[in-house]
Design a protein with these regions (language model features):
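Conserved alpha-helical scaffold segments that buttress catalytic/binding sites
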Residues: 8-116
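Fold-level signal for large, globular catalytic cores of enzyme and receptor domains
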Residues: 1-5
Length: 116
């Protein structure tokens, strides 16, 4: 991708690092792999369209926070929510859609296994 030999790419990354915020390690995540890769792709390679698709039992609250006001990265998360009672708490509501220029670029698909 970075040397112009492919037009598109896809990576499956473990561990996700998605609880690590821009200024806070959390959920056993010390750095946010996807956010670092996205920023490097933008800065060093001029990538303009980046999608981070996070499918995990927990919301990627760190990744969401890092790109919350950013319209250059589309962040999509599918995660367990249980009405805000599942880790990491109320973060990851379908109402959290981004802010400013990033509004609409932060998409949350929470599901409830325990609706109470």
């Amino acid at each position: 991708m970075f040397n112009n030999t492919v037009d598109q790419s896809f990576a499956i990354v473990r561990p996700p690092g998605h609880h690590s915020h821009s200024n806070l390690a959390a959920g056993f995540c010390y750095f946010n792999n996807a956010a670092v890769a996205a920023k490097v792709a933008q800065k060093e390679q001029g990538s303009r369209k980046i999608v981070i698709f996070d499918w995990d039992v927990h919301v990627g609250d760190g990744t969401s926070q890092i790109f919350y006001g950013d319209d250059t990265v589309l962040y999509i998360s599918i995660h367990r929510y249980d009405n805000g009672k599942f880790y990491p708490g109320p973060k990851g509501s379908e109402k959290q859609v981004g802010m400013g220029k990033g509004k609409g670029f932060n998409i949350q698909y929470p599901f409830n296994l325990n609706p109470n």
